[in-house]
């Protein structure tokens, strides 16, 4: 799924379906340039079931509410997540389904394969992809990530 400006087709942020009415996304996607400059729910639409933005075949959902983590810090991206509440539920299908959440936090999936998807830039020129991109990666430990990011990973 992708977040778009109403009337447009090019996603500028992604997210994950967690229920038929809720999307998990990055909090920085729900603000303009500062913590004081939160976007209005009506300024965001959610494209669901989209694979190729050039074909205009997607379900479009409006956002009724944006709930960001209360400790989100726009300057350093701490707690960078928001929940979008949709005005109408998503009809689940082979193209649109909620993410699978772990049954237990005891398993961190270190060493397992995870698939990452998005419409991000595909080259140095900064052009976004028109088709949903995906790559398989190996999940690293929290400790390794925290070391790599100089202790900036929050629990």
Question: Model features per residue range: what roles?
Answer:
Residues 50, 61, 81, 86-87, ...:
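Chymotrypsin/trypsin-fold serine protease catalytic domain
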Residues 19-22, 26-27, 87, 113:
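Conserved SET/PR-domain catalytic core that frames the SAM/AdoMet-binding pocket
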Residues 7-9, 54-55, 73-76, 107-108, ...:
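Short glycine/serine/proline-enriched coil/turn segments at secondary-structure junctions
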Residues 2-6, 23-26, 30-74, 135-136, ...:
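Conserved H-D interstitial segment of serine endopeptidase catalytic domains
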Residues 3-20, 76-77:
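A conserved glycine-rich beta-strand in the N-terminal activation segment of trypsin-fold
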Residues 41, 77-79, 94:
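Short, solvent-exposed loop/turn segments at the edges of secondary structure
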């Amino acid at each position: 799924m992708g977040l778009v400006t109403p009337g447009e087709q090019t996603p500028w942020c992604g997210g994950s379906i967690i229920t038929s009415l809720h999307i998990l996304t990055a909090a920085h996607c729900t603000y303009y340039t500062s913590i004081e400059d939160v976007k209005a729910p009506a300024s965001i639409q959610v494209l669901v079931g989209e694979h190729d933005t050039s074909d205009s075949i997607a379900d479009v959902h409006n956002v009724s509410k944006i709930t960001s983590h209360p400790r989100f810090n726009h300057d350093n991206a701490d707690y960078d997540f928001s929940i979008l509440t949709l005005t109408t539920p998503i009809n689940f299908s082979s193209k649109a389904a909620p993410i699978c959440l772990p049954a237990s936090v005891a398993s961190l999936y270190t060493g397992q394969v995870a698939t990452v998807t998005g419409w991000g830039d595909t080259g140095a020129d900064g052009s976004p992809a028109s088709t949903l991109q995906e790559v398989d990666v190996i999940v690293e430990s929290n400790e390794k990530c925290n070391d790599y990011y100089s202790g900036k990973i929050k629990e």
